[in-house]
């Protein structure tokens, strides 16, 4: 259910883009993200920090897109979110000395410290590369290609990287945890 809620604004954005234009899609994205946030609060009495940050960025960059009637702002949102994710992962590892991935999954998984560090760094690099790819596609290719990349390309890349991370984790789990 939660994964569906996370992807709902993206689906709404894509549908409105295909039916109308980038500005209607941006408006729909803001509304859908707000509805999902409100629903999460009412249903689960909890809103995740990243969902709240994403909502704020959607409102800010979406609002700028609509106010200035300039789609470059909504295109930057993707890269800014990925930069924040990468930054949080790197700060957790290099400043706080405990990888964010370990903080998020450490209660469920037992892994050696170097594995947590490599996994954390891999996700940071992944987010940086996705942000850079977004910049290139958003500003050098036609808008419809960027929308398809944002909706399908980044989603597929994230799913593939999640699967690869799962394989990496499984390979490094203690033998008794694998069964």
Swiss-Prot record:
Record bears the keyword rRNA processing: no
TM region positions: 22-42, 50-70, 76-96, 121-141, 149-169
Location (main, coarse): membrane
A Pfam cross-reference name: IspA
InterPro entries: YciB
Function, in words: Plays a role in cell envelope biogenesis, maintenance of cell envelope integrity and membrane homeostasis.
Stated name of the protein: Inner membrane-spanning protein YciB
Topology within the bilayer: Multi-pass membrane protein
GO-annotated cellular components: plasma membrane
Compartments it resides in: Cell inner membrane
Lineage: Bacteria, Pseudomonadati, Pseudomonadota, Gammaproteobacteria, Enterobacterales
Family per similarity comment: Belongs to the YciB family.
UniProt keyword list: Cell inner membrane, Cell membrane, Membrane, Transmembrane, Transmembrane helix
